[in-house]
């Protein structure tokens, strides 16, 4: 590949012991994800979120550089998030950490995968208990 080592960076995060009300609040999650994208320096293109009954939210923020997604399970205090950024200008960990803080996640586990390089190699794995 020409000037980049990868086509992109993909952070997959497991967030546990999150605030129930925040995990179930679609407007809050939508704004949190837009703010996370902007904080990381991304350009927001489109936003789509859905509130499930009786609880839970799924959504995506499309950015010029790729996307941020969430699937929340308030009854378990759990959220599954992905932050994928193309190129090397934006650090997806900035957005992922902002989201974890915003959901008051007490336990976090994440991996970062380089995309577009062929075989997968896990570059980062961390668990934080607060």
From Swiss-Prot:
Modifications the protein undergoes after translation, according to the UniProt entry: Is synthesized initially as an inactive proenzyme. Formation of the active enzyme involves a self-maturation process in which the active site pyruvoyl group is generated from an internal serine residue via an autocatalytic post-translational modification. Two non-identical subunits are generated from the proenzyme in this reaction, and the pyruvate is formed at the N-terminus of the alpha chain, which is derived from the carboxyl end of the proenzyme.
Gene3D superfamilies linked to this entry: 3.30.160.750, S-adenosylmethionine decarboxylase domain
Pfam family, any one: AdoMet_dc
Active site: 66, 71, 86
Catalytic activity, as annotated: S-adenosyl-L-methionine + H(+) = S-adenosyl 3-(methylsulfanyl)propylamine + CO2
One GO CC term, this protein: cytosol
Task performed by this protein: Catalyzes the decarboxylation of S-adenosylmethionine to S-adenosylmethioninamine (dcAdoMet), the propylamine donor required for the synthesis of the polyamines spermine and spermidine from the diamine putrescine.
Name the record gives this protein: S-adenosylmethionine decarboxylase proenzyme 1
Gene that encodes the chain: speH1
């Amino acid at each position: 590949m020409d000037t980049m080592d990868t086509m992109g960076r993909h952070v997959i995060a497991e967030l546990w012991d999150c605030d129930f009300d925040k995990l179930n609040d679609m407007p809050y999650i939508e704004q949190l994800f837009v703010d996370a994208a902007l904080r990381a320096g991304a350009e927001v293109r489109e936003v789509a979120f859905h509130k499930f009954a009786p609880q839970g939210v799924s959504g995506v923020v499309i950015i010029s550089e790729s996307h941020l997604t969430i699937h929340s399970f308030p009854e378990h205090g759990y959220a599954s998030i992905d932050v994928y950024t193309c190129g090397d200008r934006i650090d997806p960990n900035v957005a992922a950490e902002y989201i974890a803080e915003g959901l008051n996640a007490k336990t976090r586990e994440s991996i970062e995968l380089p995309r577009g390089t062929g075989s997968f190699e896990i570059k980062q794995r961390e668990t934080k208990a607060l």
